[in-house]
Amino acid sequence: MKKNINVLLINGPNLNLLGDREKNIYGDKTLSCLINDLKKRSEILNISLNDIQSNAEHVIIEKIHSAKKEKIDYIIINPAAFTHTSIAIRDALIAVTIPFIEVHISNIYARENFRSHSWLSDISKGVITGLGLDGYFWALETISKRCCV
C-alpha cells in the first residue's frame, strides 16, 4: 500500500473572500467549498490535506516553520498578495526544505505589472497560475504522482 502523503495547503490574504471577491477573476465558489472538494479528492489520492488561510504574514510563517515537526511532505501555497512582497515567507520555505508548489487562481502575469514578480517561483517545484480553482487540483495530482517515490 502506498504511503499516505501529508500535504499542507496555505492560502494567503483575502482568499477568505472567495465567492464574494471579484467573481470575474476568482469565481463564485467559497474557500470552504473549495477546501471540502480538495479534501474529497485528497482522500482518493491517499493524501492527508491540512489547510490554513491567514491574512497575517507571521501566521503563515509560523505554520511553515511547524510543518517540519508535523511531518508535512509537501506544501501547496497560494501566497496571494504576499507573492510579490514577502521575502520572509520565501526564507521560511527555504529554511524548512519542504518541497512546494505555488498556485494562483488568476494569471499573475496577465494582470497589473506589480503582480508579475513572485519571490517564491524560483524556489518552488512548480507554479500553476491562471487555471482558476483547478490549479489546486492539478497541484494535488502532481504531488500524488511525484511525492515520496
UniProtKB/Swiss-Prot annotation:
GO MF annotations, alphabetized: 3-dehydroquinate dehydratase activity
GO biological process entries: amino acid biosynthetic process; aromatic amino acid family biosynthetic process; chorismate biosynthetic process; quinate catabolic process
E.C. number(s) listed in UniProt: 4.2.1.10
PANTHER family in the record: CATABOLIC 3-DEHYDROQUINASE
Entries under NCBIfam families matching the protein: aroQ, PRK05395.1-1, PRK05395.1-2, PRK05395.1-4
Family: Belongs to the type-II 3-dehydroquinase family.
Protein name: 3-dehydroquinate dehydratase
Organism: Buchnera aphidicola subsp. Schizaphis graminum (strain Sg)
